[in-house]
Amino acid sequence: MLTQCILYRQLTNDSTYIDMESSLRDWLLGCNPWGVCMIVELPGAKCYPTQPHSFMISEGIGNTTGGLVDGPVYQGIFNSLRGVNMEGGINYMRYQPNVMVYHDSTNDYSTNEPTMDGTACLIFPFAAYEAESRSRK
């Protein structure tokens, strides 16, 4: 949706959806119930996933820097999953809304696994914002 909002604004010069665009971007950057940027180790973010579900973490060889994690899932879905546990993770218990959950844990593949498609889709918005910033100078 973020990409569609940006493209609509750029192609039509119509700012009808600018609030939606801003909200979608800001949610990914940490304006969400958990206060967590959903991009691993994003520079400038105060709080971001530090323990994504990745072999790089479990093998101690690095992190998935720049990866967009899955994000929250419905509590019912999370509770039905097998092999998920919160050992050694940050569970954000006091911030969990009643119907959704998010955890920063290498053992939570449902909410904290970096996704290739999501990460790839972030390239366009960030490139678009960079281009817009440069054109204003």
Provide a role label for each language-model segment.
Residues 1-137:
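Aromatic (Trp/Tyr) and acidic
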